[in-house]
Amino acid sequence: MNELTGQLVQYGQHRQRRSFARIKEVLELPNLIEIQTASYEWFLEEGLREMFRDISPIEDFTGNLSLEFIDYSLGDPKYDVDECKERDVTYAAPLRVKVRLYNKETDEVKEQDVFMGDFPLMTETGTFIINGAERVIVSQLVRSPSVYFHDKTDKNGKKGFGATVIPNRGAWLEYETDAKDVVYVRIDRTRKLPVTVLLRALGFGSDQEIIDIIGDNEYLRNTLEKDNSESTEKALLEIYERLRPGEPPTVESAKSLLYSRFFDAKRYDLANVGRYKMNKKLHIKNRLFNQTIAETLVDPETGEILVEKGTVLDRRTLDKILPYLEDSSKGIGFRTLSQVGGVLEDDVTIQSIKIYAPKDEAQKEINIISNAYIDEEVKNITPADVLSSVSYFFNLLYQVGATDDIDHLGNRRLRSVGELLQNQFRIGLSRMERVVRERMSINDTAAIVPQQLINIRPVIASIKEFFGSSQLSQFMDQTNPLAELTHKRRLSALGPGGLTRERAGFEVRDVHYSHYGRMCPIETPEGPNIGLINSLSSFAKVNKFGFIETPYRRIDHETGQVTDQIDYLTADEEDNYYVAQANSPLNPDGSFANDEVVGRFRGDNTVFNKAQMDYMDVSPKQVVSAATACIPFLENDDSNRALMGANMQRQAVPLLNPEAPFVGTGMEHVDARDSGAAVVAKYDGIVEHVEARSIHVRRIEVVDGKEVKGDLTKYKLQKFIRSNQGTSYNQRPLVKVGERVKPRDILADGPSMEKGELALGRNVLVAFMTWNGFNYEDAVIMSERLVKDDVYTSVHIEEYESESRDTKLGPEEITRDIPNVGEDALRNLDERGIIRIGAEVRDGDILVGKVTPKGVTELTAEERLLHAIFGEKAREVRDTSLRVPHGAGGIILDVKVFNREDGDELPPGVNQLVRAYIVQKRKIRVGDKMAGRHGNKGVISRILPEEDMPFMPDGTPVDIMLNPLGVPSRMNIGQVLELHLGMASRYLGVHMATPVFDGANEEDVWETMEEAGMNRDGKTILYDGRSGEPFDNRVSVGIMYMIKLAHMVDDKLHARSTGPYSLVTQQPLGGKAQFGGQRFGEMEVWALEAYGAAYTLQEILTVKSDDVVGRVKTYEAIVKGESVPEPGVPESFKVLIKELQSLGMDVKMLTVNDEEVELRDLDEEEDLQPADALNIAPQPDTEEEPVESFE
């Protein structure tokens, strides 16, 4: 064993594990939700300021008034986070902006603070609370704005090229070649023009001018031949005709059109990242690399020759002349061109250097033009950019330059919360700007104040719309802490401005070599979203441009040692370096032990000489995400099963008694701490007071080298709160009074946590064996002990609410006095008519008694007399009480009442709101879904009495039997190693940590098993619990960590006798949520036809489905005990006839004797309403599209 292997390592304050890691950790894992918090912080500090700076000043059409936004501040939120959840309001702070109005005529300046709406704040755990619900803003992966070049092959096999200039917002510019070697340009997806037309329009009018700039070549000659415009004016008119067909073109309007499309900073925005990528792509040094220069470069100041003509520019030569190239005062290759009569009047500076075309005998000269390093502040495209991108395109035709891989992470970037919010806020501000301009021109300029000009409605609306209905604003997955953490680290390629599922091809979804250390190759949903929704890798960070960076250890080239200096590299920076694997053997001094090192360079994984290496991986787990890093022996699992394992851990239901895994990976502590489910200390201190609902910590500050006691910090704990998914969210104190805590220590466990570690399931004794065929097809056989001892018992909380509103006929009333309800049904209601806390309820029980006024009918004389005698009481009301829905029930955990009179904020028209929480304790039962961490999932098929389970030689019965046939074909061998190591861990009484790709190997597992006194093969004799006889063969038995998943049979079981019907077809609705029936489909009808079961078939097609009259009469007949009447005509048949008649056909239904059948309507049937007869309200059509979910 390695000296590190088998050492005890402390994870948090309360757990030690024996770690099998061989590689020392050089870098701490970062805070895992930093991607959310840092981005939002940037938005509050910089993003908002940038927005106001962009929009200031707003001037009216005459230029007399100008409105400037000077500064802004955020106030304090009205309610704290818990109150917001309770009251169903948004956690937000008021945004106030300091505005200055300047009147140029009178030189008058007015300043004012303007309230610009409440701005949603991010909680400490990286979520937002919108209308009382916790939501997460998912980061979006989009194409970075830049210039992209690609090659294409036409149908005749001829190779050509295309290029696109993609801005952050604004018009696209595309170049392409055709079969005749002419280069075309498309402006904003319109018809194509020869590219020279665009160059002429920029003010380079004559053929000779263009040839001088771009350099003479056949492609350019072909293009010039195709181009009919001889001058700048003609070119401008031609472009105008293409962009605005049918309008009379003039030179001026063409100039202003082109200006507004490309050169106006308000309309065209490359953003910081676009300018950076553009300058990088068009930079002259990358394009000169390894080319032969065709002119002698001279230092203009000293006259010294830098590079002789005909020199090949390798890395060294380039590095030598780079300072001269980048210094515009030296002027090497810099040219200033004047745009005569073009769109812009200013001169254009470019940098142009001649080289020889590679692989060309005739030594053809090519001009390489760069945009002369445009300043980062210029966010719009410039004529120099256009010239140099056109030049790059012509260079590509001569194999100079490189095409881009659009799936490379150097060309895809993240838009996190801050930027998404900023874009939304920008939309709101620009709508507001329009209003301000209009009001400036209407109102009296002398008396006007800023407040009157500004309408904040559009700003508030755009923010609300973003949080409420954007595809990227999602209801947080709160099933367990891991689900919460993963949701905050999710990267989606979908959403506004991104891809759509249907359009996304195979390449976008595939794993790319640049994902290494940035995006997890394993964790992604199965199904239509595969590869479009990803997870951030564990060590990855996002830089200021939105590119994902991953850390590497730098290798010192002088000494050949791997240093502990960490560099974060983006995907395109990494392309320039050779990177060694994290598990490369090192000498004690940090140099490579072997001459040959396994490493990566771009897409190649091969063996390199150690002298070539530039960097080394930080950790083996930097490849995978937070959830995947929780799978022990990941290296022994097939990737498809590992994907299922990572996804199913997120569906684990928090158990009543959580237990951390015996065999973990060491990530459990980090995931639990950063998820936001635990209570984490903010400061140094000593615990002074611990109780179930709060923990008090006395802060300790260091003053003059001495420790001094400071303020008391109080941490509130959540007890049995309903999570977003209906699981119980409960925190339990972990620390004791007098304990010393440091910042980021865990004070209290959240749900699915034990001793500060993630604990999604339980360690159970598993045998891999069949038992009477009950574990066929991955089914699970379980011992009754797990039910009796509440091993897999979970707590679920449902919330039901009822509101009393004002109706047209009068207000609804919450009361105990409900018509036609016996005293027995009211026994658990208090005097207000609201259920008491602690009552046990079943489905159909009343939770809140409520009556609604019915329409007032004309009273008869007798009724009026009764009214006169007994007063108002006989008023018509109907029972609209809130009842427990089908299949629900449990114990009332809590009741909350909100009254308008008490000053609670309620929606308009609502007087009172009552919320009841029902808690259920669900033991595990047949039909529940279980899984291990290796994608080994199954459904419980049988729960056996403890005495029938097979038992070990010492008499211990096993807990679970799994089918051994589930392992070989699935190739998730990790579960077998976990089984053996888990058993050893139980015997030794030590928890194990086997980190991914750096954990225990077979040898380690065997040695640990021997130390625990087990057989080397991990098998044991088992005895049949029924007969006491031993089984024929020895069986693998061990401890496996098994999880109970959120797919519970209680949520899926459903039955209906009568219920709601669809409005048009009158057929029963479908699905548990609608209390629907089971569809008896086309094939099932064929089956009955084949059997000749005529009466059954007739019933199914009529009275059990949509014969409206028949089903009412049948119901009556069954109730009265009479024989079932003749069925009538199904409603869907009537609908069909009506549809045919609506097409203008005359359709009648005739009997055998050619008499027309009367299709009677229900109304004619003695005014019998089916709903009244069955006591069921008719349901509206619920055949809408299902709501789009993100899995």
Curated annotation (Swiss-Prot):
Stored SUPFAM superfamilies: beta and beta-prime subunits of DNA dependent RNA-polymerase
GO biological process: one example: DNA-templated transcription
Entry keyword set: DNA-directed RNA polymerase, Nucleotidyltransferase, Transcription, Transferase
Region: Disordered, residue numbers: 1164-1191
Reaction(s) catalysed (UniProt annotation): RNA(n) + a ribonucleoside 5'-triphosphate = RNA(n+1) + diphosphate
Matching PANTHER family: DNA-DIRECTED RNA POLYMERASE I SUBUNIT 2
Protein name as catalogued: DNA-directed RNA polymerase subunit beta
Name of encoding gene: rpoB
